């Protein structure tokens, strides 16, 4: 476009969770993750099914991986905060490594509600670029039903308590 090149950011990540969780300053967060690709699917019966399933696996595995990495990262940040509490304050304030560790450590809490789009089989392997009127209306109706299922669990909207500072709720399970 006008001499500039563009590409689909979905090739890197359809859900930019890293940017949400890594934003500074870190804050307790309620996050709705909309995943347009289903990690669970039927065994392909033909080559068209294989192409569709390949995309589902390719795109959905990244969102799960990113979620798992963020959960682990928050666990380590919390552990680091707890370890720093064992170091005397005068050492923490004067030691550059302790100061840097203090910048990284946090005790924030995250509740992630995962909405997984369960699509109609008829969109096939081209569903990543299917934006026709019928397809979009079905997507919107499905999304409305998914968010309704999520909101039927008001406890999911609360931040986690106790040792587990990062929880994930699957609204389409």
Regions found by a protein language model. Give the residues of each.
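Non-catalytic peripheral regions of patatin-like phospholipases
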Residues: 2-6, 10-173
């Amino acid at each position: 476009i006008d001499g500039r090149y563009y590409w689909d950011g979905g090739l890197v990540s359809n859900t930019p969770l890293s940017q949400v969780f890594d934003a500074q300053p870190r804050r307790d967060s309620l996050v709705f993750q909309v995943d347009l690709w289903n990690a669970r699917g039927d065994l392909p019966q033909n080559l068209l099914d294989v192409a569709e399933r390949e995309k589902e696996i390719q795109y959905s595995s990244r969102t799960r991986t990113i979620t798992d990495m963020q959960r682990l990262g928050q666990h380590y940040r919390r552990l680091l905060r707890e370890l720093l509490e064992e170091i005397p304050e005068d050492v923490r304030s004067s030691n550059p490594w302790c100061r840097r560790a203090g910048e990284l450590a946090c005790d924030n809490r995250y509740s992630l509600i995962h909405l997984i789009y369960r699509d109609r089989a008829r969109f096939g392997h081209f569903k990543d670029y299917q934006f026709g009127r019928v397809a979009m209306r079905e997507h919107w109706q499905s999304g409305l039903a998914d968010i309704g299922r999520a909101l039927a669990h008001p406890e999911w909207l609360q931040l986690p308590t106790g040792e587990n500072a990062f929880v994930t709720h699957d609204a389409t399970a």
